[in-house]
């Protein structure tokens, strides 16, 4: 993917607008989880060090477009940035007709979703964003799959449009895993439903040497192999699809499972052979034999893509399968990339964040890239790089 990179540009004295992903949870005016801001700090610091007249914007929550709403203000993010950067940071509310910024100064432009035309990407709004800057930096991978005013339109009309370090790193890691994977390549896809991950499974079945399925998705494959899944979450209307995928791809078959009788934190866990599941059972995890077999596959891989846990890891008695998978990925010398909300929660729970080669910040954008879809904001940056 050939895009202009912010790291290659001279930003001294230039008006620079960064579209970041600062969509963080806020409670009582305080940021409660700062991961996305922390991920953006190196980009901000680099632009300030380069002497940019720096503006940054993001969405936060889902406000009614065209209306200011204090609940969705970026003010708590501004307060966080003041502390993190130990420098003054201004919040600009009305900025579409221009902002005065000094070299080495940072101004946060209020929630871009307060602007009418943001979601529809109206040309009028896109041109107003573009007029604010000499250089537009797209650094919000999590919104790259949306063609909105602050992600796509501004990149179309800004004098220069480039990828920030976060976005460039994300594209590089995904390209390494998906476009030119070192083999063998193993993909692990968990989640509750085949239907929501069908395109992902189909796309990965063409790339991966082995496709590991987990969670509710695995139940559909277990049923497709002719086993009883009891009361487990299972999409019986997709059994033929599962059979087709299993015939076309190397999908390891689950041999043992961990079952309970109801979806609750207190239901006792029982390990069973996959052929011994009864009508009253609910499958909530893979068993130890299956987990060990998958760990061996992971340890022999050269590239690993992980999207989704293999069991209900939130309940400790059904977390062993996901823990074994997580620890195998952590111990493997392979290049590994992980993405998706539940996957990140599992990485946190088992403390392996520093052992995964790359953790993707974009949920929907990550999945769309894996599905082989074009990400509009990235496509626009590529178009501008060619011009």
Curated annotation (Swiss-Prot):
Pathway(s) per entry: Carbohydrate degradation; glycolysis; pyruvate from D-glyceraldehyde 3-phosphate: step 2/5
Sorted UniProt keywords: ATP-binding, Cytoplasm, Glycolysis, Kinase, Nucleotide-binding, Transferase
Family: Belongs to the phosphoglycerate kinase family.
Gene from which the chain derives: pgk
Sample GO molecular function, one term: phosphoglycerate kinase activity
Record-listed substrate binding positions: 21-23, 36, 59-62, 113, 146
Annotated residues for binding of ATP: 197, 314, 340-343
Pfam families per the UniProt record, alphabetical: PGK (PF00162)
EC number: 2.7.2.3
Keyword Nucleotide-binding attributed: yes
Biological process annotations from GO: gluconeogenesis; glycolytic process
Enzyme class: transferase
Subcellular location: Cytoplasm
Record's catalysed reaction(s): (2R)-3-phosphoglycerate + ATP = (2R)-3-phospho-glyceroyl phosphate + ADP
GO CC aspect terms: cytosol
HAMAP family: Phosphoglyc_kinase
Identification of the protein by name: Phosphoglycerate kinase
Quaternary assembly: Monomer.
């Amino acid at each position: 993917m050939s895009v202009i990179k912010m790291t290659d540009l001279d930003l001294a004295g230039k008006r620079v607008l960064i579209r970041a992903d600062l969509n963080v949870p806020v409670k009582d005016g305080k940021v409660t989880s700062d991961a996305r801001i922390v991920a953006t700090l190196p980009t901000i610091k680099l632009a300030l060090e380069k002497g940019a007249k720096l503006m940054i914007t993001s969405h936060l929550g889902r406000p009614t477009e065209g209306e200011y709403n204090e609940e969705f203000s970026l003010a708590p993010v501004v307060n966080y940035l003041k502390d993190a950067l130990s420098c003054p940071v201004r919040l600009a509310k009305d900025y579409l007709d221009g902002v005065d910024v000094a070299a080495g100064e940072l101004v946060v432009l209020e929630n871009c979703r307060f602007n009418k035309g943001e979601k529809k990407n109206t040309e009028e709004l896109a041109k107003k964003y573009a007029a604010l800057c000499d250089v537009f930096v797209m650094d919000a991978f999590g919104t790259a799959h949306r063609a909105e005013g602050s992600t796509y339109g501004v990149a179309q009309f800004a004098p220069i449009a480039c990828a920030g370090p976060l976005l460039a790193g994300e594209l590089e890691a995904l390209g390494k895993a998906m476009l030119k994977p070192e083999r063998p390549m193993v993909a692990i896809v968990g989640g509750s439903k085949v239907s929501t991950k069908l395109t992902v499974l189909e796309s990965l079945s063409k790339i991966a040497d082995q496709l590991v399925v987990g969670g509710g998705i695995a139940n559909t494959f277990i049923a497709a192999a002719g086993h009883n899944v009891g009361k487990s979450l299972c999409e019986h209307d997709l059994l033929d699809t599962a059979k087709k995928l299993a015939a076309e791809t190397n999908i390891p078959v689950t041999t043992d499972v961990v079952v309970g009788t109801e979806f609750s934190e207190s239901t006792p866990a029982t390990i069973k052979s996959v052929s011994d599941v009864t009508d009253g059972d609910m499958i909530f995890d893979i068993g130890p034999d299956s987990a060990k077999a998958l760990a061996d596959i992971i340890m022999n891989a050269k590239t690993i893509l992980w999207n989704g846990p293999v069991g209900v890891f939130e309940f400790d008695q059904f977390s062993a399968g996901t823990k074994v998978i997580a620890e195998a990925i952590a111990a493997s010398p392979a290049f590994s990339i992980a993405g998706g909300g539940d996957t990140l929660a599992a990485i946190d729970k088992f403390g392996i964040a520093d052992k995964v080669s790359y953790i993707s910040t974009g949920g929907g954008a990550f999945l769309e890239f894996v599905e082989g879809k074009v990400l509009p904001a990235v496509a626009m940056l590529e178009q501008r790089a060619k011009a």
